[in-house]
């Protein structure tokens, strides 16, 4: 905020991603938790990423369930890469998915060209981190992109909540 060319407020910085998915329809095949709903239906396709604070309203969370969504690009388009942002915060029982499965469709019924992205866990009980995973180079066309981030389900033996239900948190899906 400036008054007479004098800065009167604090500055902030936010990265905005431009993607073919921005503002597109997202079908939630598994619903996110009402407790961690981000900004609602468009959270994963709004171009905004979360901080390392899980409650900053940029993250959506799934407890024990997989993140399972289908994005409708509204027309068939060339796709070269898919990226996703995830939060890892073991102290809050938030773990990275074990892997992500992407599949693609022209008609929204038949999905093919499955691509699996392996994700390696971070340091046990390390500090919170935002991790971005990506598909690598794709060379295909599709209208619908199905994204399934597989939740590990339960906290590992080394965790204080061993056996308890884990969370998967995501803030953005970027389609190039």
PLM regions and their residue ranges:
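Short, compositionally stereotyped local motifs that mark structural "simplifiers"
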Residues: 1-68, 87
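Surface-exposed loop and turn segments in beta-propeller and other repeat-based domains
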Residues: 118-124
